[in-house]
Amino acid sequence: MCGIVGVVSHSPVNQLIYDALLLLQHRGQDAAGIATNSGNKFSMHKANGLVRDVFRTRNMRSLMGNAGIGQVRYPTAGSSSAEEAQPFYVNAPFGITLAHNGNLTNVEQLKIEMFKNDRRHINTDSDSEVLLNVLAHEMQEATTGYSLDPTSLFKTVAALHKRVRGSYAVVAQIAGHGLLAFRDPFGIRPLCIGFNDTEKGQEYVIASESVALEGLGFRFLRDVIPGEAIFIDMDGKLYNQQCAENPTMNPCAFEFVYLARPDSIIDGASVYATRLKMGEYLADKIKREFSHGEIDVVMPIPDSSRPAAMELALKLNLEYREGFIKNRYIGRTFLMPGQAIRRKSVRQKLNAIGSEFKGKNVLLVDDSIVRGTTSREIVQMARDSGAKRVIFASAAPPVKFPNVYGIDMPTRNELIAYGRSDEEVCREITADALVYQDIEALKRSISDVNPMLKNFEASCFDGVYVTGDISRDYLDRLESVRNDAKPENDDAVRSQLNLNLAHVD
């Protein structure tokens, strides 16, 4: 999962992009990068770390230009080495930088095509570098001479759609020409546009979530629709065209469950409102399965589950209390690489308020249960604080299958619900009872907010992969690549190599 942003303005954009990345930091805490364009020259800085740590004053001063792109990354394909931080750059044709949110599912095939047919070398394991090279090749094929017009760019994206499979929301710069953005034909990963009126004309921001637009003082214009390409030239003129033959809207359901900020609007649906609906439908199920008096108090697991827990408590007429305090300086545990790190971080991240638990039958509400590491630790914390009985509720259905579209759910065996019944999962997390959201209720939670959304990418819950190209062999290969057993010092070795090369005079 990543957060991306692109800006075309009439004044320097370095601070705008930095601020946007801070607003998207929840989408990735592994690396950050910014590339700006002034005339025909790119300036770029990227590194591993949080936005506030990657960019210092000297870095910001070097990022000159009135257009630029940025990204915050959590790695889902390739490694987490600094050399794979984005944006990526290629010098021909014209000079292009690119930032990508998603995951390509036919990347190995594309690498072979790149080498044998397109004569292009891929230097990292990142699928984003592959995507950039496909874009560059198709742009070379679509243009003649030194000119570049919107028609050629839309032809480029149309050709890319025919070659590339998977999920991709993209912002790219073409040196001296402008900003290109596009979304895959299934609309899996979010992308939206905002604008601002100035004395010199309109300026635009394109970002993963609407919260980035609003936080910059831009007005939300609309979402980029599946398969669409948008080009904004350096004068701030916007062009758009549908570039896919059969686009369909299949937004990722997990964006609404966990990934997106609650104050964002994705594809016309308020994330906050969908989470309230999840709580409402979960309350209906709990009412059917538990009798009056079995639950004394409802508590959320901060922060994503809070809207669902509040609505659930309201509908069941139960007391709602905050039982855990979150340390906001600890990253999101689901997005932390390495199971051992996740387990250790839970108690550093959350601290129980003992008086809220003592002698009570507690219903704990979380947004989802993925690996079960966090859930198990939280149940134990509740017991240690004196809870009489601990019931655990998930606002999402059981996560039983890997996600191949840009979320780090690497192996089936790591998913606690894979191959287990609800009763077995309950025993694994040591709860007294467990309640999962039904998948149809989850989908209704989103459709109730925006009835235009009828189909979803919900493969981690139902095992249905909307792109239609995912086989068991593919999942086996993916698990091998993303396995947590990867040597811990691998990235350190690669980074050291890069550092040595960087100091060669």
Where are the model-predicted features located?
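Conserved short alpha-helical segments that host acidic/polar catalytic motifs at enzyme active sites
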Residues: 1-226, 231-296, 301, 389
